[in-house]
Amino acid sequence: MELKRREATPKTEEETQGLYFARTKKENLEFISSGNFLLDCVLGGGWPLGRMSNVVGDKSTGKCAVKSATVLTNEGFVDLEDLHKHLPEGITPFEIELAISKGNKTQTSHFYKEDVMEYVHVETRHGYTIDVTPNHPLLVWTKDCETVMKRAGSLEVGDIAVISKATHMYNQDSDLDINLAFILGVLVADGINPRHGRIDISTRREYLQELVYNAMLSLGVKPFLRQHNVGSLDRRFTQQVYNLLGCPIEFTARNKYVPNCVLNASFEAQAVFLRGLIDCDSWSDNKGLYYYTASEKLATQVQLMLLNMGIVVSRYFKDGSNIGEKFYDHKYWTVSISGRYFNLYSELIG
C-alpha cells in the first residue's frame, strides 16, 4: 500500500477559530444547532438539551437559561417559568422579538424544554444574576482587557460581565391605565390581598393617601380614606385588581411580585407603578435612594425594570431584621440607587 501525503486544504477563518471549541464537544449529548458555525463550536456542538429554556435566535442571541430567568421582548418582560408551564417538552416553534442590547433586537425561532442536571449561577457585585448551563456563552471583559464570549462554566472571579442598559423596550400596545398602574404599585408595597374582598392599603403618608384616593376617583371608583389606610370596597374594582395580580393565594411581604400586566406595559405605566411601589417602601439620604423588600423576586424584577430604563442599581440582602420589638429571621433585600442614576431616576420616575 502506498501512502501519499495530501496537501491540507486551507481552513476557513471559521474552522480555524472554532477548532479548539470543536474538540470540547461532549459525548452522548444531543444538541440543537444555533444556526451559526462559530457559536456551535463555542457551545461544544450547539444548544444542549436540558430543563432549561432555549430561546433560539441567530448568532449569539440564543438563551440556555433555567426557568427562573427573565427575557425582555417587544411584549415586555417575560418570565421563562411562565412559558415553561404552558409549553410542552421538546422543541416548539416560538417567535417573539427579543432585546439583545441597546438598539439591537432579534426574532426568535424556537423554545426548547427538557431536563438538565447542571447549571451555573453567575452573580455580579451589583447583584445582577443569571442561571445558565455551563456551555452558555456570556460576553465578558477579562483581566487581559479583552471583550470575549466565555462559557459560563469557565468564568473566573474578576471577569466583568457586559450587561446592556437603557434597552428601552416596552409594550406600547398595552392598555394598562396609569392610574391603575399606580394603585397596583402602592398595593404591592403596602396592601392586603384583594381576595379578602376589598382594596386596603396601609399608609400614614398623607400625600400617598391623596394620590391613591384621586387615582381611584379618576377610575370611577368610590374610595375610602382613614387615618392609617386608604382603599375601596367596590367589588367590581376589587375583582379587577385581583385578576390583574394573577389571583394570588399568598400575598404576604415575602410573596410580593410585579404583576405581569405591569411587566408587559408601556414605559409610562411601568414608571408610575415603580413610583407608587418605591415611594411606599424606601428611604433616602445624601447618597441615594434605597428600596426595601422581603421578596427576592420583587427586588430582582425592580432591578431589571430600572435597567431597561437605563438606571443601574445595586441589589443586596441582609439576614434578619428587627421590626418593632420582633426579629424576623429571613432575608431582606435592598435596591440601592445612587450617583447619577439617582438623578436619572428622579428625572424618569420622580
Which residue ranges define each predicted feature?
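Polar, glycine-rich mid-to-C-terminal structural blocks
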Residues: 327-345, 349
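The Walker A/P-loop phosphate-binding site
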Residues: 2-64
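Short intrinsically disordered, low-complexity coil segments enriched in acidic
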Residues: 64-73, 303, 310, 344-350
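Long, charge-dense accessory insertions within large macromolecular proteins
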Residues: 65-109
